Amino acid sequence: MAEQGKEGMLPKNIRQIGQISGNQKIYLEDYVITYLRQILTPDENMRVMILYGHKEMIEDELYWFVNGAVEAQHDFFMEKTIIDEESWKKVNEMAGKFFPELTVMGWAITREDSTEDLEEQIMRTQRQFFRPDQKLYFEYITSDKTEALYLHEKGKRNMLSGYYIYYERNECMQNYMVSLRTRERHPEEMNADHAARQFREV
């Protein structure tokens, strides 16, 4: 993304999801979206991730590039917010280790189903832990494999009609996934490509 001109600054290998509209364009890197879709295990109800990346203003349009994600510990039964100060502190430590050059873009939830109404907790979490410019929110429901991308603006959560998935080498995200896998396996048995393939397997 270093050539001159708009097209030279955008990823070349992309896949469009839905219809793209408006002056804010969202690009989710493939390793990140795969991680969000496959992180939940059969015995879990929900996982929460903080999204990292960077933004570029190109020809009066704001482009969001999300190429990092760090899991945040949460309490499913927490009444006020989904995460707390302690989990946020741990996320910052992990992000400093694996994504030192990226900034917070927003967050994501992967959960089993949508029967539990979390709207109040989601909005409260957004207000308490994220700045107005950290407004991206992604949700994936594993039971029916549906997903949606939102922007929090003016106190509301607005669903986007479309976004892009892009494909690039992403060593930082691969290294983070390796760190998760090696909790269950010996480090010498795992490398970045192997871990990435495991997350991509359906």
PLM feature spans:
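N-terminal beta-strand/alpha-helix entry module and adjacent surface
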Residues: M1-G106, R111-A195, V202
